[in-house]
């Protein structure tokens, strides 16, 4: 039999080499012919030695495992325990191979996303001038952490998703369509009609997630300006916005 190696490629590890041999021999991971794979695996390691390439202990351990499975398959099955041990060893190897293949696909996808992200250009944040007057002494952000805001945002996105139709329709959104200043004025108008409003009332009116985010940021800006205060009676509960009345 001729040596099956045509050229040597760089492998990330022993599982990478095994997957290459399985694909080369047109085998399924669940139906590997150990005797064929073992011989070719050892030939790869031998060639790596000839080329003075570094062979890590992981490759050697995998080779020993393959040899052990192969040798046990050739020995007569005297005891049931030996047969069970051999099957378990091969089963564990198959499971690890399947798991490695999944991670390899995920890493390839993430690598593609990393490359495509470099081609994305984002808009600079809007600069909002904050008026110094009408400030209250109470600091409404005192007991609020970034984690609280993140959880709150996720809850709002969940509510938004429940309000939408099951069939999602792709829309093109203009970059400047939703502005924080417009949403600030929108919230001011709503609070002028009634002093206390629920934030969830505005979600069904939003066309997309971006509009929900901009509305949420407008609410934070009004809190920062001390024009409103928010009340939440429980974690992930309803957000009540109340207009702050400053005594002159």
From Swiss-Prot:
- Any one GO CC term of the record: cytoplasm
What is annotated about its quaternary structure and interactions?
Component of a cohesin-like complex composed of ScpA, ScpB and the Smc homodimer, in which ScpA and ScpB bind to the head domain of Smc. The presence of the three proteins is required for the association of the complex with DNA.
Q: Name one GO biological process term.
A: cell division
Q: Which UniProt keywords apply?
A: Cell cycle, Cell division, Chromosome partition, Cytoplasm
Q: Which gene encodes it?
A: scpA
Has keyword Cell cycle?
yes
Which family does the record claim for this protein? Belongs to the ScpA family.
Localization: Cytoplasm
Spell out the NCBIfam families in the cross-references: PRK00104.1-3 (NF000994)
The residue range of the signal peptide is none
> What does this protein do, in the record's words?
Participates in chromosomal partition during cell division. May act via the formation of a condensin-like complex containing Smc and ScpB that pull DNA away from mid-cell into both cell halves.
Species annotation: Clostridium perfringens (strain SM101 / Type A)
Q: Does the keyword Lyase apply?
A: no
Q: Which protein, by its recorded name, is this?
A: Segregation and condensation protein A
Instruction: Report the Pfam families cross-referenced here.
Output: SMC_ScpA (PF02616)
Q: Which domain of life is it from?
A: Bacteria
């Amino acid at each position: 039999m001729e040596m099956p190696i045509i050229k040597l490629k760089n492998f990330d590890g022993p599982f990478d080499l095994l997957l290459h041999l399985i694909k080369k021999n047109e085998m399924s991971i669940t139906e590997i012919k150990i005797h064929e794979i073992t011989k070719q695996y050892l030939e790869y390691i031998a060639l790596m030695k000839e080329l003075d390439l570094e062979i890590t202990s992981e490759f050697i351990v995998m080779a020993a495992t393959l040899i052990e499975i192969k040798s046990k398959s050739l020995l007569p099955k005297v005891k049931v325990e030996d047969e069970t041990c051999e099957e378990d060893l091969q089963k564990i190897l198959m499971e690890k191979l399947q798991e490695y293949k999944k991670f390899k696909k995920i890493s390839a996808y993430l690598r593609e996303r990393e490359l495509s992200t470099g081609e994305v250009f984002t808009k600079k944040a809007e600069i909002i001038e904050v008026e110094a007057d009408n400030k209250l002494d109470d600091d409404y952000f005192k007991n609020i952490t970034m984690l609280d805001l993140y959880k709150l945002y996720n809850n709002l996105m969940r509510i938004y998703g429940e309000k939408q139709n099951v069939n999602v329709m792709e829309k093109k959104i203009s970059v400047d369509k939703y502005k924080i200043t417009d949403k600030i004025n929108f919230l001011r108008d709503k609070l002028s009609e009634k002093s206390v409003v629920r934030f969830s009332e505005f979600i069904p009116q939003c066309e997309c997630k971006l509009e929900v985010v901009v509305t949420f940021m407008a609410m934070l800006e009004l809190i920062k300006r001390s024009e409103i205060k928010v009340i939440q009676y429980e974690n992930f509960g309803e957000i009540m916005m109340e207009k702050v009345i400053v005594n002159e």
